[in-house]
Amino acid sequence: GAWSAERRLAYWINAYNALVLRAVIEAYPIRGTSAEFPAASVMQIPGMFAGREHQIAGERLTLELIEEERIAPFGDPRAHLALGRGAVGSPRLRSEPFRELELETQLEAVVADFATTPRHVTVDRAADQVVVSALLGWRPDRFAGLAGADDSTGRSALERGVVSLIAPALFPSERAFLAENTFRFSYHEFDWRLN
C-alpha cells in the first residue's frame, strides 16, 4: 500500500543522512584547498550539497534537492534539524534511524537536543542575548512559519518562530527570560569543520 507521510519523511531524512555519511567516507581523508572553509570540511568535497547527484528511489538527486523537494514539502521545519550535514555545526546525528511510528517523538528529541546544545542555542541572560545556529537563518520561511499570528513582540516572524521552536526545551528560567523579550537575537557562525 501507499506509505504514510511519516514513513516517507523518515525515509528521506534517513536517505539524506546516509548519503552524507557515504560522501564523507568516499572522500576521506578530506584535504581541501579552498581557503573559504576548513581543510577537513564537507564543503571541500566538490559539489557536496548541490552538485553531486545520488541515485535514490529511482531518481538522481543532489542533497539540496532532497532537502528542498522531498523533505521541505512535508512542512515540518524540525526535519531540517534532523539532517546531519557532516559538520560540527550540524545538529547531532542520531544513533538510530528515523522510523514512521516514532517520528514525532524522534523529531521532538532532535529539537530538545538542538535547543540545549550551546553551539546551537545560547541563552545568555547576563548579556541579554540569544544566539542561535546560523542553520535557522538559512531557511527563514520554514522557521518563521512557527511564529503564529501574535506580532506584538516587535520581533521578526523568524525570531518569533525560533523562540517558539526552542522555548519548550529550555529551563523555566530561560523561558521566563525569553518572555521578557528584552534580548538581542543573533546567530552563531556555522562551524563547517568535519564532525
What are these regions (language model features)?
Residues 1-195:
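Interaction/scaffold regions that mediate signaling and macromolecular assembly across diverse proteins
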